[in-house]
Amino acid sequence: MAKVSSEIAIQAFDFRKNNSLNDIEPINCKSLLLKLNVLTVYRPLSDDFSGMCLRKGDLKFMLLNSKHSRGKQHYTIAHEFYHLFCQVDFKPHACNPGNAKGADASEKLADAFASELLMPEMGLKKMIPLQELGSKDISVSTILKLENYFSVSHSALIFRLRNLDLITPKQYEFLSQLKIKQTAKEYGFDLSLYESGNEGLVIGDFGIKAKQLYSDMKISESHYYELMNSIGIDPTDDTNEE
């Protein structure tokens, strides 16, 4: 298990390096999806369906559940990055990251990769006050700061901290019982991380290519509309700009 953990940590480190990210900073998942040219579509899906991805040659696609919190969406994106860019024998399937119980080996590896990628160990430690780090008694305010800084869900963060032995089992249980959205509100944090969102959002250059084909008169107007409608966009809708 230690060997597997080390290999996953190296893969996450290399992924950051290959994408010009240092080894401690938080990741902007949407910017990275655009940079890596992964066509990404957000749709409301069932609660046990977090997302999935497809890969064929240089073409990459990701489907994400807009009903899940933004923090969980970010974890799902990182999980799918493992399937798209690290896993050799990848086969498309529905994913429910963070639910490793009963999951196959590749899902557990993808979860481990997501944790390493989004919450690098040294990045976490640098954000935790030394006194709290030494006592393994991390304050609620620091917990909230960490999950908002790294843009991850509360459950993903405390699981990572426990896995790194940065909090005790007792504190993990205490933090697990928090009503995190209410707690974040009481501490003055923005609540968008803990809420669903992005329904209908499309990330990627699909629309750019479709528009270019239409502008170059290589496809008809009706074909252009058909392509845009396939990703949930109606170009004829008035945006009401003044």
Where does each model-flagged region fall?
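Active-site hotspot residues in diverse enzymes, especially metal/ion-binding acidic/histidine motifs
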Residues: M1-E242
